[in-house]
């Protein structure tokens, strides 16, 4: 996966031209402690407890609030370390971001942190999950 910058939307550059200025993901970013990305509109008690548990481990925690599947992409690019989701989502809410995350070497797991998220289930609801 790549992060593209400086692309003029009025031009139609080729993929080779775009890749010249692209940054391969994940980017190597130095963080102080753990950077957590969470939902602006779906902050739950479980999310707060998850973040509090990270803080109890003795590392400083920085919280970034963001909307939509951008949260998955922030982990994929290296701007955030982890994204816990303790609120309802559907497969279509996560599929595109999941593809980007996997290409960048990250993945989406059930909240246990071990079982990969699966698609094309009979019930299209996602379980609570974590991106890392």
Where are these regions (language model features)?
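Acidic beta-strand-loop-alpha-helix segment within the catalytic core
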Residues: 1-72, 116, 121-132
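Hydrophobic residues within well-ordered alpha-helices
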Residues: 36, 74-76, 96-102
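Short, glycine/charged-enriched secondary-structure capping and boundary segments
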Residues: 50-53, 78, 97-98
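Glycine-enriched alpha-helix->loop->beta-strand junction motifs that scaffold or abut catalytic
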Residues: 56, 79-81, 101
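Alpha-to-beta junction loops
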Residues: 77-82, 105-107
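Short beta-strand and adjacent tight-turn residues that come in two discontinuous sequence segments
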Residues: 85, 110-111
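Acidic donor-binding loop at a coil-to-helix junction in glycosyltransferase catalytic cores
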Residues: 92
């Amino acid at each position: 996966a790549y992060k593209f910058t400086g692309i003029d939307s009025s031009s139609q550059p080729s993929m080779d031209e775009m890749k010249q200025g692209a940054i391969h993901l994940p980017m190597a970013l130095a963080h102080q402690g753990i950077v957590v990305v969470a939902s602006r509109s779906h902050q739950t008690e479980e999310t707060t407890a998850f973040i509090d548990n990270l803080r109890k481990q003795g590392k400083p925690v920085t919280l970034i609030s963001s909307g939509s599947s951008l949260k998955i992409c922030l982990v994929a690019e290296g701007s955030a370390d982890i994204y816990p989701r303790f609120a309802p989502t559907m497969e279509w809410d996560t599929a595109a971001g999941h593809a980007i995350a996997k290409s960048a070497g990250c993945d989406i797991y059930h909240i246990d942190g071990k079982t990969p998220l699966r698609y094309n289930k009979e019930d299209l609801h996602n379980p609570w999950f974590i991106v890392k």
